[in-house]
């Protein structure tokens, strides 16, 4: 497996939207890179984001559930992690997102949306292979 892109929103110290494109020539040319920075810069948060998208858990925080999410940045109402990767020549995208009610920091934690997609060249779009979504109730 080769990680191609990582997109993060509000995971631990990585508040806001962040993305890294490992297909960028700056990364591709060297073949090797390091994750470095001062304490609190987001090095572990970046690795957490990758684990969350792929597995729904991290080694240091455990599984995220509908009642607990230690990875969501404090004071925010939504978190998301997306990893695009290549496995056996096929491009996949793993996505994990979770929000609080009304997208407010004090809202109740909602069920996570989890998705695994494969790139389909024929339709030039992502094809969902597996997904778990919070269903919105219909108005009566």
Q: What are these language model-derived features?
A:
Residues 1-140:
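Extreme N-terminal "head/tail" segments of very large remodeling/mechanoenzyme assemblies
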